[in-house]
A protein has these predicted regions:
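Catalytic beta-strand-to-alpha-helix segment of the class III nucleotidyl cyclase homology domain
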Residues: 4, 41, 63-165, 169
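Exposed boundary/loop context
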Residues: 13, 45, 52, 94, ...
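Generic detection of intrinsically disordered/low-complexity segments and helix-coil linkers/edges
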Residues: 15, 30, 60, 146, ...
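Intrinsically disordered, glycine/charged-rich C-terminal tails and inter-domain linkers
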Residues: 132, 139-210
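Charged/polar helix/coil "stalk" or linker segments at domain boundaries
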Residues: 208-218
């Protein structure tokens, strides 16, 4: 491959991030680092089980690649369930919660790292996810829905920063079901407002025109 060629591939991207990590660190740095280490051990064990590999870490974030969408989802579900058990234990001092986003898309390989929209959308899905939750893209949903027993909640088309995508929550508990504004509903609202403005301006123009006609006739 020449230096100018871009090395691309299709990949399943898994992004996990700790909720409120900075606040935990401010409260008790040592205990938080210890708790994160234990969560990391759980995740590494599951990544090994489901054949996922970490390609980047940034502070409290973990970015991993999977060859299988089903494996990525099952890894995420098992990880959240393991964390729930850990947090319910009275022995757990610092209870860390994670958000997880999973996407399948085109990525660029560079110096052992993965870049591009495929990664960016996974990160946006992670930001969209609830604490202790998992959000996935439609590309993942279409593959895993007939092959897994988990429950999904359709969030519709979402826009986070510059990325627009169809998202789904994986419901680990019925209480996680939510309804949030979709990109299409925002467009409908904007269209409705624009239409109202046009009608209002049309009414003003019609009123002024009729008034002028009456004045001229007099």
């Amino acid at each position: 491959m020449s230096p100018n060629e871009i090395d691309r591939k299709l990949a399943v991207i898994f992004v996990a991030d700790v909720v409120g990590y900075s606040k935990h660190m401010e409260n008790d740095e040592n205990a938080t680092l210890k708790a994160y280490g234990k969560c990391e051990t759980i995740l590494n064990k599951l990544l090994n089980k489901y054949k996922g590999s970490i390609f980047n870490t940034a502070g409290d974030s973990v970015l991993a690649e999977f060859q299988s969408a089903v494996n990525a989802v099952e890894c995420a579900v098992d990880f959240q369930n393991e964390l729930k058990k850990r947090n319910e234990s009275k022995k757990t001092e610092v209870k860390l919660e994670f958000r997880i986003g999973i996407n399948m898309g085109d990525v660029v390989m560079k110096d052992g790292n993965l870049l591009g929209d495929g990664v960016n959308i996974a990160a946006r899905l992670e930001a969209l996810a609830q604490p202790n939750g998992i959000s996935i893209s439609k590309s993942i949903y279409d593959i895993v829905v007939p092959k897994t027993k988990v429950t999904f909640n359709d969030l519709g088309v979402q826009k986070v920063k510059q990325n627009t995508f169809h998202a789904y929550d994986i419901l680990l508990d019925p209480s996680q079901k939510r309804k949030i504004k979709t990109q299409s509903s925002n467009i409908t609202m904007i269209t409705g407002v624009a239409a109202a403005i046009v009608i209002l301006l049309g009414g003003i123009f019609y009123f002024n025109y009729n008034s002028q006609v009456i004045e001229n006739s007099e």
